[in-house]
Amino acid sequence: MSEDSEHVLICVAWPYANGPLHLGHVAGCYLPPDIQARYERSLGNSVLMVSGSDEHGTPITVTAEQDGVSPQDIVDKYHMINSKALRDLGCSWEPNVDSRGIEFGGALFNRTSDEEHKLIVQENFKKLLDAGFFERKTTPQYY
């Protein structure tokens, strides 16, 4: 990496792990950032691209009830299927975070249940909270 290179973070959507990915996922949220990551790497930039399976939500519970299994069974199954599908399509999702640390780039397709993921989210939330970026207020909600 040269002195002119930059650190680039590409954050990709985290779809629910309640079923297999479809063409809309690939064209809409995975192919564009993969192209961007490849472009940035071609410029010599250090790129970290992150995404994964969102393992929380009603769609997972509904699928589990329909299949007669636990929500954990559903997310385990579809995280594996979806991460393999993206790699098979040639997307940059091989688990290849640089051994020196995430600041040196790579790709990470993770899970919201991962302990490290939980810690990072909590740390960032606390930093934003302490910096005054959140405001508590009441608003009407229409449903």
Labelled PLM ranges:
Residues S2-Y143:
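N-terminal, positively charged nucleic-acid-binding surface of large information/translation enzymes
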